[in-house]
């Protein structure tokens, strides 16, 4: 089956009968999604804010506790940290390299199954990161994180960023 492009309400233009059925199934699944109530949206937003503030003060047990199942997906580096042990290891590695790492919230956006956050990530390179010796330089990078939910349970933080922006600031 060949996929050409995105059309309309998230449907894909497919060239065969199976594709037509896939479009129909996808459309009806989209229609079945429930728009979260104001109460659910407020609960999700409180949880995301608590999560981000706990990251800022390096209270990683609270961060892990905000998840129904802890999972970080860092798209720029193609790394996934799944489960409490892997998430703790990620915090240890990243905060060893950037002990003052913190985030500054820019905006929150709500979707059916996510809270989308725009934020600045800041830090000073004081420890080895992936073989790169500390430079003592600071970085500031605009990022987007999708906090994915099942109901009010946080199941994943998927982070998008430009790693070249950070690398350029650390090495120039």
Task: Give, region by region, the residue ranges found by the protein language model.
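C-terminal and inter-domain tail/linker signature
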Residues: 27-172
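Cysteine-centered motifs
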Residues: 12-14
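Residue-identity detector for glycine
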Residues: 8-10, 19
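Basic polycationic patches enriched in arginine
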Residues: 23-24
């Amino acid at each position: 089956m060949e996929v050409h492009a995105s059309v309309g309400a998230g449907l894909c233009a497919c060239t065969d009968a199976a594709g037509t059925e896939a479009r129909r199934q996808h459309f009806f699944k989209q229609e079945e999604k429930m728009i979260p109530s104001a109460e659910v949206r407020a609960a999700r937003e409180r949880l995301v804010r608590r999560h981000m503030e706990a990251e800022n003060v390096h209270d990683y047990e609270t961060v892990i506790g905000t998840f129904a199942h802890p999972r970080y997906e860092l798209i720029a580096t193609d790394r996934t940290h799944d489960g409490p042990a892997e998430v703790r290891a990620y915090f240890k590695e990243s905060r060893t390299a950037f002990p003052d790492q913190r985030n500054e919230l820019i905006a929150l956006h709500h979707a059916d199954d996510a809270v989308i956050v725009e934020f600045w990530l800041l830090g000073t390179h004081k420890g080895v990161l992936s073989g790169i010796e500390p430079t003592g330089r600071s970085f500031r990078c605009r990022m987007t994180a999708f906090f994915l939910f099942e109901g009010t349970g946080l199941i994943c933080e998927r982070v998008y960023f430009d790693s070249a922006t950070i690398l350029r600031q650390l090495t120039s």
